[in-house]
Amino acid sequence: MPVSVQTVLDDRIAQYVNRIKAQHHATEAAVVRELIEAGYEETVRQRHARYQRGECTFRAVAAQLGLSVRELYYLFEQKGLPV
């Protein structure tokens, strides 16, 4: 389910967004969405690494990401991350 957010960015992130927006002829929303998605991907990979090292359970990772166990399994599978 899509979520709409409004936020204020600090200067360095705003400068980055404006630079990318100009270079790629993209909207601010598209650039910010890409940044958020990249951050989420990194979070998923970090949680996966912790799971692989035995620092937390699969169920705990699912809870941290707000997913069911089945959804997390599917997400890891989609990203080619071993379960």
Over which residues does each language-model region extend?
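A general alpha-helix detector
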Residues: Y16, V31, C56-A60
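Residue-level recognition of short, well-ordered coil/turn positions
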Residues: H25, E55-C56, G80-L81
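Short, basic amphipathic alpha-helical segments that act as recognition/interaction helices
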Residues: T27-H48
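Surface-exposed, Lys/Arg-rich phosphate-binding patches that contact polyanionic backbones
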Residues: D10-A30
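Residue-level detection of the helix-turn-helix DNA-binding "recognition helix"
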Residues: N18, A22, E37, Y74-E77
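Short Lys/Arg-rich basic patches
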Residues: M1-D11, P82-V83
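Charged, low-complexity intrinsically disordered terminal regions and linker tails
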Residues: R33, A63-V83
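Short, positively charged interaction helices/loops
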Residues: E42-L65
